[in-house]
């Protein structure tokens, strides 16, 4: 492993670098110190993880938008779909289950780029936790907006305030956990069936004395 990388004080973000922080050179070419470099690198890791989880969720939402009774993908858990539709104020009474699914999918896809408001799934969190997020100003907005904000803010000549970098990292992390990942999980259950407890058989052959099983 790279010792400089483990310390987090190497920056490869812009074309003028890479820059490495040492006692003799405490700042990079753009003026970033070790705190800013570590913060930028961490923020970009958060953005990458959020993009990965959330783009998976986007594909699942597109799949549900194309689901049909005789198609390759069908609705396996209608009850969970109805529950989610009601949470999102989607009309369900007297409607075909696939019409409901398509509208719910459209609402979910808006979570990635909507211009106003915060993530819909935040209201599923404990009220006390929602209050903390609101007071800290880290309620995630549109998923793609949070990722783009980090990529923009960590570029050369932009944010050099470590507190701001950590703040946006927290907000983007919540966009992952309480938006992208929630969409991916709930929609997967609706399309493929909610996992249930099952029984299986195993013997001592699955255990190894030198491993934690």
Feature-to-residue mapping (PLM):
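Metallocofactor- and cofactor-centric catalytic cores in central/energy metabolism, strongly enriched
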Residues: 1-213
């Amino acid at each position: 492993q790279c010792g400089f990388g483990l310390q987090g004080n190497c920056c490869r973000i812009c074309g003028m670098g890479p820059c490495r922080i040492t006692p003799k050179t405490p700042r990079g070419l753009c003026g970033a110190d070790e705190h800013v470099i570590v913060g930028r690198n961490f923020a970009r890791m958060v953005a990458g993880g959020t993009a990965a989880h959330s783009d998976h969720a986007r594909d699942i939402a597109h799949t549900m938008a194309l689901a049909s009774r005789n198609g390759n993908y069908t609705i396996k858990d209608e009850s969970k779909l109805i529950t989610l539709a009601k949470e999102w104020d989607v009309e369900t009474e007297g409607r075909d289950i696939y019409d409901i699914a398509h509208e719910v999918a459209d609402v979910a896809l808006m979570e990635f780029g909507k211009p106003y408001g915060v993530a819909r799934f935040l209201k599923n969190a404990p009220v006390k936790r929602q209050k903390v997020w609101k007071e800290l100003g880290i309620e995630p907005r549109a998923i793609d907006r949070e990722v783009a904000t980090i990529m923009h803010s960590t570029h050369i000549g932009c944010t050099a305030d470590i507190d701001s970098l950590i703040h946006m990292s927290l907000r983007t992390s919540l966009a992952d956990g309480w938006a992208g990942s929630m969409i991916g999980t709930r929609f997967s259950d609706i399309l493929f069936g909610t996992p249930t407890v099952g029984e299986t058989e195993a013997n001592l052959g699955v255990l190894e004395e030198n491993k934690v099983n």
